[in-house]
Curated annotation (Swiss-Prot):
Membrane topology (UniProt): Multi-pass membrane protein
Domain of life per record: Bacteria
GO biological process: protein insertion into membrane; protein transport
Keywords of this entry: Cell inner membrane, Cell membrane, Chaperone, Membrane, Protein transport, Transmembrane, Transmembrane helix, Transport
Protein name: Membrane protein insertase YidC
Role of this protein: Required for the insertion and/or proper folding and/or complex formation of integral membrane proteins into the membrane. Involved in integration of membrane proteins that insert both dependently and independently of the Sec translocase complex, as well as at least some lipoproteins. Aids folding of multispanning membrane proteins.
Main location as per UniProt: membrane
Transmembrane segments: 6-26, 350-370, 376-396, 447-467, 491-511, 525-545
Gene3D superfamilies from the UniProt entry: 2.70.98.90
Pfam families, A to Z: 60KD_IMP, YidC_periplas
Length: 574
């Protein structure tokens, strides 16, 4: 198989993939009205706090001041006190990066104040929402078989007022809530927001001043009716993974897409530490328990809602004792630097460069280089250009081998033409004679393909880096490129890509190519140009700069071998 055929196969595979995406877009659009008509979505505050119903919730391993670990029933038959019923006032907590609306039990709405929805707009991204069609909430509640627990509306803010804001010069906002149950049992819940941080600390203290032991367990869940995304080249949101992910020290990173959420059955697994999250393009939510905390990880459906949940720990609080449990709730962007500060093992995988570890590692390495270049150049577009230059330097030995292979192919092109003339339409004999010539002259027909094949994983990894990196969201390069994660609005870069591919094609020998392949090759620049018109402009920038440097190096290498580029162009034009 020669280099041209390899290139054609790769090109048509990419075209087929894009056609499949467009077909998926039409299919999703056709199914959307039916799905919307058949779903009835309850509001988050109408959902019962006692929804967990799994058995064998892990007992607490080490809870300060707590009595013996409790036993959670096989089915949750939670008793909520009459005093807990009703609707608690919605309280607003505001930091420099988050605005949360919550009732002490559920975070009903979360706005990301530093991330506008559109480039020129002022309305912030709303990650958690009470939208009637597609609600998305984070909830933390308590369940028990016999002991009283807070129900919907059970928690009340300790301080008067419904609005709490991080003041100027203040680094921490602490807002406590409390539920007062019967017979002296209470739960004090404290929300802590920090300046510049998207992880919300939530601490629960179960205080038992009654004369009897209290038994129960905490559950923390994310529930969402996912938005139906059209799968097409013009919708970059659909390129990114949308669904649930979780991480355990034992099994590592796993994920489940919304579109086939329960196809493999629900998740029901005991894990110590780890985290569970719901991902979308550029943003995510996650529950992060304590490292030594054992929880039951659960994926299930609650009507139209997809639910990702942690259950546990379960424990018994003796009379006169207090038990404490803590967790973090992340509501925010996939910012590498801030995720790293949380120091949670595996949490960096929410930046989903690939489900395959090796591709994810390549993506992380590329972003590391890209971010360091940005720290010097202060522009993500120029950082991409710098990354291309570095990659060309690193891959130069392979590129040199590719050009040498091309030079050999050009040298033997007249002899290949003679073989073509000798055997005419007998393709089998022609191919046999060609391979014998290559073997005799020690020519590797795949030598020019190897550098291309090695660069493909880098190209695909970089594609996901540019799609996934929220750091590049709405980041400008220069002039008409004001968002590197959006397509080129004027198609200038795709047009440059077509011109560069056409020029490169003219400088590349195509010995032994049949007329059909030659015609297909002539259309390749247009095919790739059409594809590049709908992908992120940052990726097209990479491809244009890479192709331009490749063209210059190829021109220079041809001259180094004593050949004239104009002669090669005329030969390929025949």
């Amino acid at each position: 198989m020669n280099q041209t055929r390899v290139f054609l196969i790769f090109a048509w595979l990419m075209v087929a993939a894009l056609l499949w995406m467009e077909w998926g877009k039409e299919k999703a659009a056709a199914n959307a009205p039916v799905a919307a008509a058949t779903q009835s979505v309850p509001a988050a505050r109408d959902l019962d706090a006692a929804t967990p119903s799994a058995a064998n919730v892990p007992a607490a391993q080490a809870i300060p001041q707590a009595g013996a670990p409790g036993k959670v029933p096989a089915t949750s038959t939670t008793t909520a006190t009459p005093a807990a019923a009703g609707t608690a006032p919605v309280v607003t907590l505001t930091s420099d990066v988050l605005r949360l609306k919550l009732d002490g039990r559920s975070v009903l709405d979360a706005e990301l104040l530093q991330f506008p929805q559109t480039k020129d707009g002022t309305a912030p991204v709303s990650l958690l929402t009470e939208d009637a069609a597609h609600p998305y909430n984070a909830t933390s509640g308590w369940a028990s078989e016999h002991s009283p627990v807070p129900g919907v509306g059970g928690f009340r803010a300790e301080q008067p007022g419904t609005t709490f804001e991080l003041a100027k010069g203040q680094n921490t906002l602490v807002v406590p809530f409390v539920w007062n149950g019967p017979n002296g049992v209470s739960i004090r819940r404290t929300f802590t927001l920090e300046r510049g941080r998207y992880a919300i600390s939530i601490k629960d203290e179960v205080i038992n001043k009654s004369a009897a032991p209290w038994n129960g367990y905490v559950f923390r869940k994310l529930s969402r009716v996912p938005t139906i995304l059209s799968r097409g080249m013009t919708n970059p949101d659909s390129f990114s993974f949308n669904g649930a992910t979780w991480y355990s020290p034992q099994a590592g990173y796993e994920r489940r897409a919304f579109k086939d959420y329960m196809d493999d059955g629900g998740l029901n697994r005991q894990i110590t530490g780890g985290w569970i999250a719901l991902l979308q393009h550029h943003f995510f939510t996650a529950w992060i328990p304590q490292n030594d905390q054992a929880s039951l990880y659960v994926l299930n459906k609650d009507g139209p809602r997809d639910v990702a949940e942690l259950r546990g720990p379960a424990f018994t609080v003796a009379p006169g004792q207090t038990a404490t449990t803590e967790a973090r709730l992340w509501v925010g962007p996939k910012l590498v630097s801030l995720i790293a500060k949380e120091d949670v093992k595996g949490l960096d995988r929410v930046i989903d460069y690939s489900r395959f570890s090796i591709m994810a590692i390549i993506g992380q390495g590329l972003f590391w280089v890209l971010s360091h270049l940005h720290s010097f150049l202060h522009n993500w577009g120029w950082a991409i250009v710098g990354l291309v230059v570095l990659l060309r330097l690193v891959l130069y030995p392979l590129s040199s081998a590719q050009y040498k292979s091309s030079a050999k192919m050009r040298k033997f092109q007249p002899r290949l033409a003679q073989l073509k003339e000798r055997y005419g339409d007998d393709r089998v004999k022609y191919q046999q004679a060609t391979m014998e010539l290559f073997k005799k002259e020690k020519i590797n027909p795949m030598g020019g393909c190897l550098p291309l094949l090695i660069q493909m994983p880098i190209f695909f990894a970089l594609y996901w880096v540019l799609v996934e990196s929220v750091e590049l969201r709405q980041a400008p390069w220069l002039g008409w490129i004001q968002d590197l994660t959006a397509r080129d609005p004027h198609f200038i870069l795709p047009a440059l890509n077509i011109a560069i591919m056409w020029a490169t094609q003219k400088l590349t020998p195509t010995p032994g190519i049949d007329p059909m392949q030659a015609k297909m090759m002539q259309f390749m620049p247009l095919v790739f140009g059409a594809m590049m018109a709908f992908v992120p402009s940052g990726l097209v920038l990479y491809w244009v700069v890479n192709g331009g440097l490749n063209l210059l190096i190829q021109w220079w290498m041809i001259r180094q071998h004593g050949e004239k580029p104009s002669k090669i162009i005329r030969a390929n034009a025949k």
